[in-house]
C-alpha cells in the first residue's frame, strides 16, 4: 500500500515538473514570432543593363539567363551582369538553366 502511494506521488510530481507551464509556452511563441521575418531581396524593376555592366540586383540585367553575379578583380568584389557560369559547355548549360529559374522567381517587371 505504501509503495503504491509513493509510486503515484512520484508519478504526479514528474508529470507536474515535465509539463510546460502556460507562461513559458507563451514566451516561446513570442520568440518564434520575433524570428519569423519576410525578406524581400528583389524589387520589381525593368532591365537596364547588358552583359558586363555593373549591377546590384538580378532585375537590372536584361536577358532570360543573365543574372547579377560576383567576380573578383584585383581582390575586390565586383557585381556585374553575366550569363556564363563555367568554361565547361555542359556545366555552363546547366548554369544557364539555373539562372533562368532564378530569374523566373525574381518577379521583375
Curated annotation (Swiss-Prot):
Disulfide bonds join 47-62, 55-68, 59-108, 61-81. Keywords: Disulfide bond, Ion channel impairing toxin, Knottin, Secreted, Signal, Toxin. Expressed by the venom gland. It comes from the Eukaryota. Residues 1-18 form the signal peptide. GO terms for molecular function: ion channel regulator activity; toxin activity. Residues 19-46 form a propeptide. It is found in: Secreted. Transmembrane segments: none annotated. GO terms for cellular component: extracellular region. Belongs to the neurotoxin 25 family. F7 subfamily. Putative ion channel inhibitor. The presence of a 'disulfide through disulfide knot' structurally defines this protein as a knottin. This is Hainantoxin-XVIII-6. It comes from Cyriopagopus hainanus.
Amino acid at each position: 500500500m505504501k509503495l503504491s502511494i509513493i509510486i503515484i506521488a512520484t508519478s504526479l510530481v514528474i508529470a507536474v515538473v515535465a509539463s510546460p507551464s502556460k507562461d513559458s509556452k507563451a514566451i516561446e511563441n513570442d520568440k518564434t514570432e520575433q524570428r519569423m521575418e519576410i525578406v524581400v531581396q528583389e524589387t520589381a524593376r525593368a532591365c537596364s543593363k547588358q552583359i558586363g555592366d555593373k549591377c546590384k540586383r538580378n532585375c537590372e540585367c536584361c536577358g532570360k539567363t543573365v543574372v547579377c553575379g560576383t567576380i573578383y578583380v584585383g581582390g575586390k568584389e565586383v557585381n556585374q551582369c553575366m550569363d556564363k557560369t563555367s568554361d565547361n559547355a555542359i556545366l555552363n548549360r546547366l548554369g544557364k538553366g539555373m539562372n533562368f529559374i532564378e530569374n523566373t522567381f525574381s518577379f521583375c517587371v
